[in-house]
Swiss-Prot record:
Plays a major role to prevent cellular inhibition of viral genome replication. Assembles an SCF-like E3 ubiquitin ligase complex based on the cellular proteins ELOB, ELOC, CUL5 and RBX1, in cooperation with viral E4orf6. This viral RING-type ligase ubiquitinates cellular substrates and targets them to proteasomal degradation: TP53/p53, LIG4, MRE11-RAD50-NBS1 (MRN) complex, ITGA3, DAXX and BLM. E1B-55K probably acts as the substrate-specific adapter of the SCF-like E3 ubiquitin ligase complex. It comes from Human adenovirus C serotype 2 (HAdV-2). This is E1B 55 kDa protein. GO terms for cellular component: host cell cytoplasm; host cell nucleus. It is found in: Host nucleus; Host cytoplasm. Belongs to the adenoviridae E1B 55 kDa protein family. It comes from the Viruses.
Amino acid sequence: MERRNPSERGVPAGFSGHASVESGGETQESPATVVFRPPGNNTDGGATAGGSQAAAAAGAEPMEPESRPGPSGMNVVQVAELFPELRRILTINEDGQGLKGVKRERGASEATEEARNLTFSLMTRHRPECVTFQQIKDNCANELDLLAQKYSIEQLTTYWLQPGDDFEEAIRVYAKVALRPDCKYKISKLVNIRNCCYISGNGAEVEIDTEDRVAFRCSMINMWPGVLGMDGVVIMNVRFTGPNFSGTVFLANTNLILHGVSFYGFNNTCVEAWTDVRVRGCAFYCCWKGVVCRPKSRASIKKCLFERCTLGILSEGNSRVRHNVASDCGCFMLVKSVAVIKHNMVCGNCEDRASQMLTCSDGNCHLLKTIHVASHSRKAWPVFEHNILTRCSLHLGNRRGVFLPYQCNLSHTKILLEPESMSKVNLNGVFDMTMKIWKVLRYDETRTRCRPCECGGKHIRNQPVMLDVTEELRPDHLVLACTRAEFGSSDEDTD
């Protein structure tokens, strides 16, 4: 992975020079000029166009297009000369009475050329890069120098990764790595990340095709020089696909930041975190598990999109889930520990059927709901505020304290209460017109089904016997008016 001297300005390898980029190195014939012909003036327009072509053939200077401002001008206007970008999309009708727009399909060659132009622009852009990661390591003679942050991420030299390069070696040597948008990368073996790094994908696609159980293992075991803005492992703007991969994409034992990363069609876990993890602006499409937060982990998941995932978020540690959107997910979030759930919008399945996956987190087997709060004898209820649920189901297990959702819209939502949790739910601060509340009375042992569980195994589930308790828990709006403080506005949050 030899890299040219970053101080030398010029065209990167694999690209043409400026002359060939601008003019192609060849003289191309310009396409035929498109001429506006107003109705009733075809003779003059044809004569003018013919005169221009004849003058061009004779070697004389072409005449300037005559035009008059305003929509009523009857002179000929050569639009292609005024706007060259319209040459390919404007044609003249057969009768010559007007113009017709032609919609051109975007071919693969045009998309490739656009990606190459974007890559050329990114690689030739001037940046204040003055030092390499190896030079920073050489300057650190002792542990005190390792702790001092003398440089920032902007000053670190970027290495542009080629499709044939080794991911692990490039991250170890250069730390700041960028991917080319016009290339497709392939991961064929496990990538161990043992130092802080900053990977900018620029929208490039990375296909994972390996038989290993993990694609990226983030485990920093050594001390590395500190760089301001490069805290842990940072990965941004990368599209991951893995149609033939059945393992975990990211297994993080160190600080991990995923910014604007997309995951497409993974039949296993996308992100499994055992420590601090921040997932921001990511998208999960048709994945089995999106983000799994193991015990003692701290996760921040915000502004993400979950679409058609079996299990979006599994929280076994301390999680903060804010400003996310979920659509057609079997279970958006399974809460086994404490969590903060705010400002999320969740739409349930379009089909009128429940999820067939179980959870055995509290020792009992229950069907996973769209938002599932598992029972825990020592944990408090999650903070549940400013969420919008549509065609969803909410499972509430037994916990300490009172579950008090604040300003949540439960539209066409079913709430399932376990036997001990009915007296611990207060729904005075929700929009409750179309919600339904059911309480589990007992479990019928004569009606059992064997279902797959989120733990990876299969369990037998007893069918619950439920009772409709909607009116028992719905507040009396003739006594508790909607103008009270639960739905009011403060100085910080005005209507």
